[in-house]
Structures are given as structure tokens and as C-alpha cells.
């Protein structure tokens, strides 16, 4: 079967056996299931088996082709496609393709593969997230991250880089110093992430401030998320977001830079600030924390 959109079909597969019948002429009234010579139920079961993905694979290295491969692609055409394409294993295709809400089982004569059982045990979003975060495609990106001996990579701490943040890191490396400062300022204005405050009166008629997350499903791979939330649980820090230094002492945190005098902030002053402020944020500033704060 000739290649279409950089795909090739293994010899002897079900898809390959369809082509001669198409060439011989198939009437329009024949349904897809008549062409495949199987019932609708069998087609559904076959689709949900991992083996069904062996019929079509993404072209990569010709040496990786399965045995008994017979295609109409020339060697030059294959090499050209192989230089710009990558191979996606069938289990990864299954993770992104098989619907988790299907309750159909494999035929009794054939036990489902372990990978398929794991796929069906979680939701679509969980499986897609797991694939995106654990795919082998990240390995090459991870190996290509330049690192210097002084522990700084283009102005950002090397240890703050995470494997799953390399896409954003590549974008940040292209920014000029002025652009980075602008991004940092914007990030601080939007920071911290997903936090809001509300007041609650206790029996002693004292105002108690609680912090709750707006969303509960924030991905855990955001760097320093727990530290961010714990840090911003200190109420007085909301008033002086741009002047706070995490590494400084408590006294220096509340010192006015213009007069050098210590600020005597009362709980009521902090309450007025918290009462009228809802804090939303963005995760981009996380990679600035170790250097700037």
C-alpha cells in the first residue's frame, strides 16, 4: 500500500489486504464492515486491542521496520522521511487513542496486554498527562540543555530547571535582559497562583484569615508550589510583595527603605489590605525565586 502522509502499512496486515479489493472495484453500497470481512462488534474489539496498532506505524529508521515489510516507498523517500520524523511506540498511540470509558473486553481467547489494563484503569486526562510528562520524546530535549560550571544558565539557576519545563526555558533563553525584567515584573504582579483570602469571625470576635485554593487539580510538577503557598500564608507579606526578601530577617522584612524605620503594622492594617485583595498568579516566576527572592 502506497505511503500517505508518511505512513506505511505492514505486509499481511488487515489494512494491506483491503487494497487489492479496492483496486478490483468495490461497489459503493458495500459497507466498511463488509470490506473488512468482520462484524461491527468484532471491529470494535479489534480497535481496542493494542495489536490493532501494528497495522500502521510512523516511519522512522528503515532498520526498525518489522519483518515481512513490503511497501511502495522508495529508499530515498524513506530516508528523507526518517530524517524528520520520530517513531511513536504502539503503546503510546494506544494511550492517546483508546477511550477510557469503553467497557468492552478483549476476546476470551486472548488476554489483554498489561499496558492496556493500565490504560483502562485511569481517565483520559490522567493517561494523557502521564504520557506527556513521561514520554521518551523529552529525553533528547533534556540532554540538549546547556549548563555552565557556575551553576547559571542564561541568567537562570540551573537547579531550578525541571525536565518538564524545558519548553518554557527555551522561550526564556531567547529573551533579552530588558524583556526578562518585564516578564519578571508581570509575573510578580500576577503572583502567587490560585490563592484568595476570606475572613471568618471566631467566638472571641477576632478576625481569622483563611487561604483556600481556587482550583484543586493544579499539576504537581509546578516547581516550589508548596513553598509558594506556605510563604504566602503569612498575612503581612501581602502588603509589601515587591519588597519582601525571603532570606532576610523578620526585622528587615518590615523596614521602610526610604526612612530606615521599622514599620509597626497592626493586625487591622493587615486586615484592610487582605480584605480588598484577591491574589491570582502565574507560575512563570517560580524560576526566579532562588535568585531574586
Curated annotation (Swiss-Prot):
GO biological process, one term: mitophagy
Biased composition (Polar residues): 98-108, 260-273
GO CC annotation: peroxisome
UniProtKB keywords: Autophagy, Peroxisome
Disulfide cross-links: none
Subcellular location: Peroxisome
Annotated spans, Disordered: 98-121, 250-273
Quaternary structure annotation from Swiss-Prot or TrEMBL: Interacts with PEX3, ATG8 and ATG11.
Known role: Required for autophagic breakdown of peroxisomes, called pexophagy, through linking peroxisomes to the autophagy apparatus. Involved in regulation of the glyoxylate cycle.
Record protein name field: Autophagy-related protein 36
Organism listed in the record: Saccharomyces cerevisiae (strain ATCC 204508 / S288c) (Baker's yeast)
Lineage start: Eukaryota, Fungi, Dikarya, Ascomycota, Saccharomycotina
Originating gene: ATG36
